[in-house]
Amino acid sequence: MLEALYAAGPAPDRARQMMLYGRFVGSWEGRFVYHAPDGVLREAPSEVHFGWALEGRAVQDVWIVPSRHARQDPNVSTPGILYGTTLRVYDPRSDLWHITWIDPLRQDYDRMTGRKVGDDIVQEFRTEDGTRCQWLFTEITPSSFHWIRRESKDDGKTWNVRVEFFFQRKATESERSGRSVTL
C-alpha cells in the first residue's frame, strides 16, 4: 500500500504549482504551542513529515505532538495531543488546493481550501458552528516555517490564535554525515 501511495516527485503536468507545498517535503522538528482560552500557553515538542503521494498529484503529511522522541522521555507526561495526516491536492481548474485533515486520535476531520497569499499559504474552512478558521504557513524559508491556526467568530474582523508550530528542517542522513549529495 505505501509503495502505491508514495511518489518520487510532483506530477509533470503540474510540477510548478505543486511546489507551493512540495517545498516542505522532508522531515521537520519543532515546538507546538497551544493558546488555551484561559490565556495559558501549553508547549510540547513536535514533528511533521511531508511527502509526495498519489502519482505526484498530492502532498501528504503526518503531524505528531508530542514528537515520538519526546514520548520516549519518562519526564514527559503530556498525553498524545495529535497524530494526524493532511492530504493536499492541487486543482488546476480552480487554481486552489483541496485539503483534508484527519486526526483519529482526537476524532477531528476538517476540509478546507488553500492558496498562496503574498509570501504565505492560507488554508480556510468553517467549523460546524460557523467559526471561520485559517491555517497559515508563514515566515517560510528553506529550513524553517511558522504555522498558525487562528479562529474568528466575527467573519474575520478579529482573530484569535489557537495553535502555533515553529519548525526547523531536520538534516538528512547525508548532511549529518558530512557527505555531499549531487542532484
What positions do the PLM features span?
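Hydrophobic small-molecule pocket/channel-lining residues, especially in calycin-type beta-barrels
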Residues: 1-183
